[in-house]
Amino acid sequence: MKYEKLEPAAIDETVAGLVGWTLAADRLSISKSYKFRNFVEAFGFMTEAALTAEKLNHHPEWFNVYSRVDVKLTTHDANGLTDHDVKLAKAMEKAAARRAD
């Protein structure tokens, strides 16, 4: 699959629309830390996100400790951000919202 890297203006617009996501200084990735009530909620989020990632064939870099999940999204094949990163970030936002206090 060929991935098209987002243009700089599209990156700025995209990140502005993703609440809580941070653009890396090199502009090649976005990241966010999620905090849940407990490990079960965090793992449920990761499971839901993993199923979406499989459907998109686009997988996150992430790290989990108890109720926290740190996520980094980039498209290695494009050496930067693509629409796949945006789709996965939006899906993660929906998954996290379903677990909100």
Swiss-Prot record:
CDD domains: PCD_DCoH_subfamily_b. One of its GO terms (biological process) is tetrahydrobiopterin biosynthetic process. Keywords: Lyase. It is an enzyme of class 4 (lyase). One of its GO terms (molecular function) is 4-alpha-hydroxytetrahydrobiopterin dehydratase activity. It comes from the Bacteria. It catalyses: (4aS,6R)-4a-hydroxy-L-erythro-5,6,7,8-tetrahydrobiopterin = (6R)-L-erythro-6,7-dihydrobiopterin + H2O. Its EC number is 4.2.1.96. Belongs to the pterin-4-alpha-carbinolamine dehydratase family. This is Putative pterin-4-alpha-carbinolamine dehydratase. It comes from Rhizobium rhizogenes (strain K84 / ATCC BAA-868) (Agrobacterium radiobacter).
